[in-house]
Amino acid sequence: MAKEDNIEMQGTVLDTLPNTMFRVELENGHVVTAHISGKMRKNYIRILTGDKVTVELTPYDLSKGRIVFRSR
């Protein structure tokens, strides 16, 4: 799948789940389950409840996503 097929949205981390999964509320009000991207995991970027994040969603399953950026 090409990278431009993904949908990027802003959201807030609501809850931390096991296995580096997070429950994220998007700007439009939807709640999705998201995991950390490989580069964030490699660089030990910590994500806490309440952080503003950028989530990449695939058009095939809009209930799951990947956290690609944590805002300060």
UniProtKB/Swiss-Prot annotation:
Boundaries of every S1-like domain copy: 1-72
Subcellular location as annotated: Cytoplasm
Keywords: Cytoplasm, Initiation factor, Protein biosynthesis, RNA-binding, rRNA-binding
Pfam families named among the record's database cross-references: eIF-1a
CDD domains hit by this protein: S1_IF1
GO molecular function: ribosome binding; rRNA binding; translation initiation factor activity
Protein family (similarity comment): Belongs to the IF-1 family.
Function field: One of the essential components for the initiation of protein synthesis. Stabilizes the binding of IF-2 and IF-3 on the 30S subunit to which N-formylmethionyl-tRNA(fMet) subsequently binds. Helps modulate mRNA selection, yielding the 30S pre-initiation complex (PIC). Upon addition of the 50S ribosomal subunit IF-1, IF-2 and IF-3 are released leaving the mature 70S translation initiation complex.
Name recorded for this polypeptide: Translation initiation factor IF-1
Source organism per UniProt: Photorhabdus laumondii subsp. laumondii (strain DSM 15139 / CIP 105565 / TT01) (Photorhabdus luminescens subsp. laumondii)
Gene: infA
